[in-house]
A protein has these predicted regions:
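Short, charged recognition helix plus adjacent turn
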Residues: 66-97
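Short, surface-exposed, charged/polar-biased interaction segments
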Residues: 31, 45-46, 56-59, 70-73, ...
C-alpha cells in the first residue's frame, strides 16, 4: 500500500472520530503539522500506526488498507469517497435520486441553506461543503466514465419532498427545495437525450433498491462503497453505517448485481420520457 493511501485513510478516520487534529496530535505526542504530514503521505512508523489506530478505535490493518473500512458519519464517508474518486477511471453507482457530481450549483445552494438552518456547528458545515466542492471539481477536471442507475420510487419522493428530504426546514425553503429537485430531474432527462460521452443514466422502474452502492475502478484496483448516506442529508445525521472495501468477493458480488440491474433498467428515450412523466405527476407546479 502506498503511503499516500495510508494518509488518506488516516484523514477519513480522523474525521470519523470527531476529534480535532490538534487533540489527536497532542495524545500522540507529535505536532499538528506532523499529523498533517502523515495525512499527506509522509513516512510513518508502524508503532505510530498502532498508536493512531488505538486513538481512532480502528484496527491497525484497517488503517493500513487491509480489510473493511466502516464509517458512521456522512462527513468521513464522503471524504473517503472523494479520495477514491480522485483516482477512479470509472464510476458505477446505484444512486440517490440524482448523481451528485453532475448536479447544478442551485442544488448546492439550496442544500447549504437547509443545513445552515438546522446545524449549529459551522466548522462541520464548512468541512462538509469543502469535501463536496472538491468532489465536483475533481470530476470536472478528470471526467471519469460514470454510469448511474436511479430508482423511480426515490425520484418520486425527491420530487414530492425536494432536496434535503430528511432535513427539517421552513415551508418557504421546502418549496424552493422542491423546485430545485424538479430542475435536477429535468436536467437528467436532458442529459439522457444528449448522450454525452462518458456519462450514462438509467431508470430502475420496478425496483426499490435496498442499497446505494458505488463501484470505483482505478488503475490498480476497484473499490466498493455501500452507502446509507444521501448526498443531500445533514452532516450531523446518524442514520447508519457505511463501508468501503476492495475485497474481491464483495466487489464481484456487487458488480454482478449492478450488471443485471443495468441490463433490466430503462434507458435512452424511454427513460427520458419516464422522467418527464414523473415530473408531470409529482413536481411542484
Amino acid at each position: 500500500m502506498r503511503l499516500s493511501e495510508i494518509g488518506q485513510q488516516l484523514r477519513a478516520f480522523r474525521l470519523e472520530s470527531g476529534m480535532r487534529a490538534d487533540e489527536i496530535a497532542a495524545r500522540l505526542g507529535v505536532s499538528r503539522a506532523a499529523l498533517y504530514r502523515y495525512e499527506k503521505g509522509e513516512v510513518i512508523k508502524l508503532d505510530t500506526v498502532q498508536r493512531l489506530a488505538e486513538l481512532l478505535k480502528v484496527s491497525p490493518l484497517t488503517l493500513l488498507g487491509i480489510g473493511v473500512e466502516y464509517y458512521s458519519r456522512p462527513l468521513s464517508f464522503f471524504e473517503r469517497v472523494r479520495q477514491v474518486e480522485e483516482e477512479a477511471d470509472q464510476i458505477l453507482q446505484i444512486s440517490d435520486p440524482v448523481a451528485y457530481l453532475v448536479t447544478s450549483p442551485e442544488y448546492d445552494s439550496i442544500l447549504a441553506r437547509a443545513i445552515a438552518e438546522q446545524v449549529e456547528n459551522k466548522q462541520l458545515i464548512e468541512q462538509y461543503q469543502e469535501i463536496f466542492t472538491a468532489r465536483r471539481e475533481s470530476y470536472r477536471l478528470r471526467r471519469p466514465t460514470m454510469i448511474t442507475m436511479l430508482s423511480e420510487q426515490s425520484i418520486e419522493r425527491f420530487l414530492q419532498r425536494g432536496v434535503g428530504e430528511a432535513i427539517t426546514m421552513s415551508d418557504e425553503l421546502r418549496t424552493e427545495a422542491r423546485k430545485v429537485a424538479a430542475m435536477e430531474i429535468g436536467r437528467i432527462a436532458e442529459l439522457i437525450e444528449a448522450e454525452p460521452i462518458g456519462l450514462q443514466f438509467s431508470l430502475l422502474a420496478d425496483v426499490e433498491s435496498t442499497t446505494n452502492c458505488i463501484l470505483m475502478r482505478g488503475r490498480e484496483r476497484m473499490m466498493l462503497a455501500i452507502n446509507p448516506f444521501r448526498c443531500d442529508m445533514s452532516p450531523a445525521a446518524t442514520t447508519g453505517v457505511s463501508l468501503v472495501t476492495s475485497a474481491p468477493e464483495a466487489v464481484n458480488a456487487h458488480q454482478r448485481v449492478i450488471e443485471v440491474l443495468w441490463a433490466e433498467s430503462c434507458k435512452g428515450k424511454e427513460a427520458a420520457e419516464r422522467l418527464r412523466s414523473l415530473l408531470a405527476q409529482h413536481a411542484i407546479q
